[in-house]
Amino acid sequence: MRVLITLAVLIGLGLAGAAAVVSFGLYNVSARVGHLPGVAWGLHTTFRNSVSLRAPAPEEVPRLDDPDLIALGAAHYATGCAMCHGAPGEEQTPTVRAMVPAPPPIAEAVAHWGAPELHWIVENGAKMTGMPAWPVENRADEVWAVVAYLEAIKGGTAPEMPSPDLDGRAYCQSCHEDIGGRVPRLDILSADYLEAQLEAYRTGARPSGIMAQAVTLVPEGSFAALAEYFSAPSTGAGAEPVPQEGPGTALARQGTRDVPACLACHGGQTPRKGPRLFGQNEAYLAAQLTLWRDGTLTHDPLMAAASRDLTTEEIETLSRYFARAGR
């Protein structure tokens, strides 16, 4: 009984002390004095163990040596990450170095982490630091682009990243005219469609951490002009692409009473509804169809219904069909 009373008294004193620290501001939160002895070690050890526990399995890591994926990650890093971690080989600003904890230079930050751990950190961020989570939820697929760039830094093969002070048009060009793969071609899309997508990215109706960051570099009032610049020409577009006969043809023509066929909305160079798909990048089409199928993209109920039951093999078949039929 005496032991229980003693423990209760100690617990009460501890709670009273904690309440006093909080209530009277006894703890100095100044970044100049840093943490108390042992606190930094405890936080860092907890952080490393927490990341290791929750990181994706190694078999979930995609191919990270794809130049297009690396370039896409470099473009996002330039405006979303470099302000704290700096560019490879460049010194951080004095302001950043005065943070507690100070964000490590990027080469140091990635040196002791594997790709799965880097993915978890970029996607989730870290409490009690300046490291934010990915701007939108359920877009782990986009995070791999940044991880690919970080892995290239570790290997000493990172490409030069775009200058963060590029204007909106130049920054768009750094991805949409220089990178293939999962980045869509804009020159086959209409200006109205592009403007609507920019607005959807701005409001979050179409979730994308990369594009949510990118549209902040463009004044909202210039969306129309930007869309007009990158869109398909209004005249001289050439003949309508003829759908190729092959495994994807029957699938693209397949529809129901409630869900029209792919070609009903996306056929030809000037589709009646939806963006043109003929000639679009295959990897981009596959990634977007997967997002629709998995319920990440929901802003168009018809597309959500059309893709809901697609298998991974059917997504690959359709993506290959539309990409090759338009070229």
Regions found by a protein language model. Give the residues of each.
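Extended amphipathic alpha-helical interaction segments
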Residues: 164-180, 239-243, 253-267
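Short cysteine/histidine-rich zinc-coordinating motifs and their immediately flanking basic loops
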Residues: 93-99, 182-187, 273-279
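Periplasmic c-type cytochrome electron-transfer domains
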Residues: 2-87, 93-96, 109-123, 132-152, ...
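Cysteine-rich, disulfide-stabilized extracellular repeat modules
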Residues: 102, 127, 168-171, 182, ...
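Extended intrinsically disordered, low-complexity coil regions enriched in Ser, Thr, Gly, Ala
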Residues: 94, 100, 190-212, 241, ...
